[in-house]
C-alpha cells in the first residue's frame, strides 16, 4: 500500500511539472509578429541588457521566471526579448533589429517593456503603442497588475 501511495505521489508531482507553462522568448521579430497577428495577442517587447543590467536581472529573477508570470504571459502576450548585451555575442542582424526598435520606442533605460499591437498592411508593419513599464517591486502579482492596466487599452 505504501508503495502504491509513493508511486501516486510521484506521478502527480511529475504531472504538475509537465503542466507548468514554459516561456518562449522570441528574438525573430517577423516570427513574433506573425504569431501576434494569428493569436490576436499584443507583442511584449522586453528591452534588456541581459549580461550587465542589474535591474533587468532583478526583473527576470523576481517576475519573469515565476510560474504566475508564465501563466499570465501565455494567456496575454507574445514575448519578444530585445537584448543589448555587452559581453555575450549576438548576430549583426539581431543587433540592428534591436537597435532600430530601441530607437523607434525611445528606450532610454533598462529594463523597459513596451506593449504593442502590430498592424500589417501591404507588407508593412506599424506598431500601435499601448504603453510601457519597467521594474515594479512586489513580484509577479504587482508587475502583472500594472501590465493589465496597460493591456486594457487595446
Segments (PLM) and residue ranges:
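A short beta-strand-turn-helix
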Residues: 25-43, 73
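Solvent-exposed loop/turn segments at secondary-structure junctions
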Residues: 50-53, 63, 84-89, 108, ...
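Short active-site neighborhood of thiol/selenol oxidoreductases, capturing the structured segment around
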Residues: 39-53
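Non-catalytic, surface beta->alpha helical segment in thiol-disulfide oxidoreductase systems
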Residues: 62-64, 100-154
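Sec/Tat signal peptide C-region and signal peptidase I cleavage site
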Residues: 14-20
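Typically the conserved alpha-helix immediately C-terminal to a functionally engaged Cys/Sec
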Residues: 55-74
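Sec-dependent N-terminal signal peptides
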Residues: 4-13
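Thiol-based oxidoreductase modules, predominantly thioredoxin-like and allied folds used
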Residues: 23-26, 48, 69-96
Amino acid at each position: 500500500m505504501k508503495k502504491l501511495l509513493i508511486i501516486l505521489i510521484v506521478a502527480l508531482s511529475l504531472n504538475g511539472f509537465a503542466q507548468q507553462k514554459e516561456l518562449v522568448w522570441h528574438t525573430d521579430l517577423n516570427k513574433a509578429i506573425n504569431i501576434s497577428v494569428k493569436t490576436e495577442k499584443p507583442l511584449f517587447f522586453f528591452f534588456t541588457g541581459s549580461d550587465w543590467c542589474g535591474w533587468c536581472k532583478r526583473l527576470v529573477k523576481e517576475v519573469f521566471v515565476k510560474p504566475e508570470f508564465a501563466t499570465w504571459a501565455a494567456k496575454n502576450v507574445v514575448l519578444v526579448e530585445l537584448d543589448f548585451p555587452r559581453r555575450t555575442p549576438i548576430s549583426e542582424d539581431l543587433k540592428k533589429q534591436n537597435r532600430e526598435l530601441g530607437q523607434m520606442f525611445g528606450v532610454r533605460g533598462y529594463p523597459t517593456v513596451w506593449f504593442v499591437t502590430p498592424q500589417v498592411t501591404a507588407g508593412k508593419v506599424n506598431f500601435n503603442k499601448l504603453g510601457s513599464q519597467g521594474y515594479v517591486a512586489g513580484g509577479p502579482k504587482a508587475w502583472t497588475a500594472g501590465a493589465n492596466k496597460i493591456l486594457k487599452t487595446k
